[in-house]
Amino acid sequence: MIWHVQNENFILDSTRIFMKAFHLLLFHGSFIFPECILIFGLILLLMIDSTSDQKDRPWFYFISSTSLVMSITALLFRWKEEPIISFSGNFQTNNFNEIFQFLILLCSTLCIPLSVEYIECTEMAITEFLLFVLTATLGGMFLCGANDXITIFVAPECFSLCSYLLSGYTKRDVRSNEATTKYLLMGGASSSILVHGFSWLYGSSGGEIELQEIVNGLINTQMYNSPGISIALISITVGIGFKLSPAPFHQWTPDVYEGSPTPVVAFLSVTSKVAASASATRIFDIPFYFSSNEWHLLLEILAILSMILGNLIAITQTSMKRMLAYSSIGQIGYVIIGIIVGDSNDGYASMITYMLFYISMNLGTFARIVSFGLRTGTDNIRDYAGLYTKDPFLALSSALCLLSLGGLPPLAGFFGKLHLFWCGWQAGLYFLVSIGLLTSVVSIYYYLKIIKLLMTGRNQEITPHVRNYRRSPLKSNNSIEWSMTVCVIAXTIPGISMNPILAIAQDTLF
């Protein structure tokens, strides 16, 4: 009898929760329509996987890519609409959030073609891979629009859990297992520190969780200059620092980059930084409005350490993926300059513009690593010597992406860095910009060293990997080459058309 009553209560409670969720989705679903498209794509993938065989593999790629493209289209149609706060204050829709969501969707859309041939060659489970990618994308999008401390904590956990699973997707590889273990342990530790910081904000503001209400609560309780806010600032900086991976929170980055499947690294290297940057700008600019000097100082220290350590250690690397890992640490130092500058001197606009270029430069480079690795099975920088003699397209596209990463004119990376540094200079960050300029010169050295290897024609320097290099038929190779072509064009052409891109980015004030 007691069990029967408990069962009825459970059913009633479950029904109430379901009806409440349905009510929220019915009346607020239009505000998260791009996210709903991805959710529908996830459900469709699961349904097709459970009712079909492996011969329907092309459908999996088609559904995933179509969901992402439709979500991008929905975002573009919603551009310029008035800012809206929905789901009882948990989610905010505005141009600033949407442009970061667009960047995340763009990353995912370009990463799926990179994965096609890799999945076929390594015989990985395709459905789970695409499910994790779409779910991580969904988590990143929710993080960009999060408007309260709980959502800001839960959304990156959705992204992080999928990232852990993706990094350990090749279970038979010892390096992949090691990367997953380190990633999981450090990710769990950083999440606990992050939520500890949120708890201090919650208590100091009198029990508020919405970002703007936290500010109002701190004013009402007169706690905006209390030691608790300093503890919250340090804890949240450490938690977000793990997602952005600036020095000294970068220890996981080289090992995860080296041990994870290359398409996964390409995905994580850009999406995690875009989502974390969107979250960092809102958290530091709103709840810590009264502590701007303190968080500016913290971020300046992180930026200096990242630019110096990232670029100097990258010189000594022999693995291509580890080199890009340290390079990404240096690159995030440049992005932090834009976060520090803020809206006052177009800091956010320059940061968004540079991140758009960074996506194309980085993914183009990883496309080359995927293609070369599948042909040769090596990731050693030395083994790329003489690639131009066997595959001129791959070598030239790689050279363009690397030169753009280094910031050489007239490529997009040069103009992106130029505007970013100019905004920092106007804001009075002279020392920070000087460090950025010097470390950019250092980065050009190790990028040019790789390009020199690619273009060498001396037989004594060409390794057996390149001598035995064979291009696959165009049919099996076109997805990687398509992504690479798009990335190369995006990393070169926009350099001569910066003004329209900057104008769009300047409209993203929140």
Curated annotation (Swiss-Prot):
Transmembrane stretches, start-end: 24-44, 59-79, 99-119, 124-144, 149-169, 183-203, 229-249, 295-315, 323-343, 347-367, 395-415, 418-438, 484-504
The UniProt record lists the keyword Secreted: no
Gene Ontology biological-process entries: ATP synthesis coupled electron transport; photosynthesis, light reaction
One Gene Ontology cellular component: chloroplast thylakoid membrane
Source superkingdom: Eukaryota
Protein localization: Plastid, Chloroplast thylakoid membrane
Catalyses which reaction(s): a plastoquinone + NADH + (n+1) H(+)(in) = a plastoquinol + NAD(+) + n H(+)(out); a plastoquinone + NADPH + (n+1) H(+)(in) = a plastoquinol + NADP(+) + n H(+)(out)
Protein known as: NAD(P)H-quinone oxidoreductase subunit 2, chloroplastic
Biological classification of the source: Eukaryota, Viridiplantae, Streptophyta, Embryophyta, Tracheophyta
Gene symbol of the encoding locus: ndhB
